[in-house]
Amino acid sequence: MHRLLGITAALAAVVALAAEPAAGPWTKKVQAGKDVYATLKTSQGVITVRLFSKEAPRTVENFVGLATGERAWTDPKTGAQVKGKPLYDGTVFHRVIPGFMIQGGDPTGTGMGDPGYRFADEFQSGRTFDKPGLLAMANAGRNTNGSQFFITTSTPSNLNNRHTIFGEVITGYDVVEKIGNVPRSAEDRPQTPVVLETITLSDKAPNAPAAPKPAAPKSTPR
């Protein structure tokens, strides 16, 4: 899903260019069965997602590693290996379709980029696209995951067992909808760039908005 439902022959030919690298320090941040939360600060607002580390550990480890910069990736402009620099910071949501999804995570910002490697799908959990707000991997076909991801604003059942679901939005879904409805070109590219500024990670759920305090009782004249 670099074009979500389509992929050019040229990109398909690139799929085998690099094997998945060995595990690294990013994997230590992801403990199987323990929730990980990612907060995406965008130019349109903040989105927080819960990552499914038990159900899609390989995918979550990859996302975490690229978000922190602990996983090496290839700079598409220079071809150099990058270590210690988060891939996602400063990237854009390059494709948005109202009532469907928003897509980002491409270091080239074109929908054709990747981190210089591919890794396998994870469908063993049986999760399906049964609700909006699911976070999933974009790909160019079976077992071609890289860095691109999308967040749904619909329930696209035709994507079941085609794209690994590895998280869900827990706060900021209104921001997802807002991004999905920005003015866009005929190619579904936002006319004004929507930037993913930073991703921060935590093993604790964000605090829910404080409930409004009850109004003080009116004093009764004596």
Specify the residue positions occupied by each region the protein language model found:
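Structured alpha-helical
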Residues: L11
